[in-house]
Regions:
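Conserved donor-binding/catalytic core segment of Leloir-type glycosyltransferases
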Residues: 2, 191-207, 213-216, 228-231
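Aromatic "clamp/platform" in nucleotide-sugar-dependent glycosyltransferases that forms part
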Residues: 285
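Short alpha-helical donor nucleotide-sugar binding micro-motif in glycosyltransferases
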Residues: 264, 272-277
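Nucleotide-activated donor-binding/catalytic signature segment of Leloir-type glycosyltransferases, i.e.
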Residues: 243-265
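Carbohydrate-associated surface elements
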Residues: 157, 179
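Conserved acidic donor-binding segment of nucleotide-sugar-dependent glycosyltransferases
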Residues: 317-318, 322-330, 338-343
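N-terminal subdomain of nucleotide-sugar transferases
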Residues: 1-53
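Short hydrophobic beta-strand element within catalytic cores of glycosyltransferases
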Residues: 302-305
Length: 377
């Protein structure tokens, strides 16, 4: 089977956690690697990156724009991207087209219609998440979903949102959860845990890093033996401005000895940090899944979250983490303080994390996707 994966606005197979690169990039990279074991897979992007061919896997960048261009400005290159695809890729030869994010969905819709190919769509994010409700984007997403043969969702939360807001036929939807790369995210039990907290994600307002800083400012009143590393680089048009706002808040709150910003890091370095940490603080407002929470659990790290959607399908309070609508809460302080000071309690929760993370495997994710393709190809 020949499979075309379209990731128009951001290039997989590179570092994640800065600009527009995040969970989508990891998702496309991991499923493409797995699918290429038994199929021919071509991944195309418009973002500048180094193309390569590795056995059955081809990654092709059409080099139309830089990584740091805002996603809004990337939209204007759509037609040029489609034209160049027609010129440089034998699109008729593919058995199935799988698009990731709404901009890729617009490209895939045209290709699938022109060559009568089955179209699979994975949103990774939804326009209804955005402040002010981006009607143009939501209207495009509705058109893409109507045109797609199958829409894959990453969580029950995402599935429910799409059904309620996009008027999609339930029979076109397939729930396939993302996985965890256990070749990377496997803990070294010989390493000693330290009083380290992590906040991992692109620096943008919807990721909620300011909420984490306010929690740390409050928590230090009851426990001051900790440090929190923020892993991720600025993303979006206001990312740099938001980062400066975060740093100023840290300075104004006298938290410089408790907080350090590390920019984005390779997954292997994130793994090494997780291996020493006792807590991941997750304050992202909107997630279709919450990959970093599953990866943290795979490293034995509990997750403190304010996300009341998809992340609660991963995290269960007092089992492998803790959910609270607000982090400024005495119960939250008690939970975190016990993780730091009660080794038996941390060990118990760590084992729960490891056990629950076994549900997530890229091998299983790719297998389910491959079965889906074969139903239509």
């Amino acid at each position: 089977m020949k499979i075309l994966q379209i990731s128009y606005h951001t290039a997989p197979f590179g570092s994640a956690g800065k600009y527009d690169s995040g969970g989508l990039n990891i998702y496309v990279e991991k499923i493409s690697n797995e699918l290429s074991k038994n199929n021919y897979v071509t991944v195309v992007t418009a973002e500048k990156a180094e193309s390569f061919v590795n056995d059955n896997l081809e990654f092709k960048s059409l080099n139309l724009f830089d990584k740091d261009l805002s996603v809004e400005d990337k939209e204007i290159y759509l037609q040029e991207f489609i034209n160049k695809l027609y010129e440089s890729v034998d699109l008729e030869s593919f058995d199935v087209v799988h698009t990731h994010y709404w901009l890729s969905g617009l490209v895939g819709k045209e290709i699938a219609n022109k060559f009568n190919k089955p179209l699979v769509y994975t949103s990774h994010s939804l326009g209804i998440f955005l402040d002010g409700y981006n009607k143009e984007r939501v209207d495009c997403e509705k058109i893409i979903m109507t045109s797609s043969d199958i829409i894959t969702t990453s969580s029950l939360f995402e599935e429910d949102l799409i059904l309620k807001n996009y008027n999609v036929d339930f029979n076109k939807m397939k729930l396939i959860t993302p996985g965890v790369d256990t070749e990377i995210f496997s803990p070294d039990s010989t390493l000693k845990r330290e009083n380290i907290f992590l906040s991992i994600g692109r620096i943008q307002e919807q990721k909620g890093q300011m909420e984490t800083i306010k929690f740390l400012d409050n928590f230090k009143k009851v426990e001051n033996n900790f440090i929190c590393y923020f892993v991720g680089g600025p993303s979006g048009k206001s990312g740099n401005e938001y980062l400066e706002e975060l740093k100023k808040t840290v300075e104004d709150s006298n938290l410089e000895s408790y907080i350090e910003f590390l920019d984005n890091l390779p997954q292997t370095e994130i793994r090494d940090l997780l291996n020493k940490s006792k807590l991941l603080i997750h304050t992202s407002k909107f997630e279709t899944f919450g990959l970093v929470a599953a990866e943290a659990n795979a490293m034995g790290v509990p997750v403190l979250t304010t996300n009341s959607g998809s992340v609660l399908e991963i995290v269960e309070s007092n089992e492998n983490g803790y959910y609270s609508e607000s982090l400024i809460d005495g119960n939250v302080n008690n939970f975190v303080k016990e993780l730091l000071n009660n080794n038996d309690k941390f060990e118990e929760i760590m084992l729960n994390c490891l056990d629950k993370s076994k549900a997530y495997s890229w091998d299983n994710t790719a297998r389910e996707i491959e079965i889906l393709y074969k139903d239509f190809a």
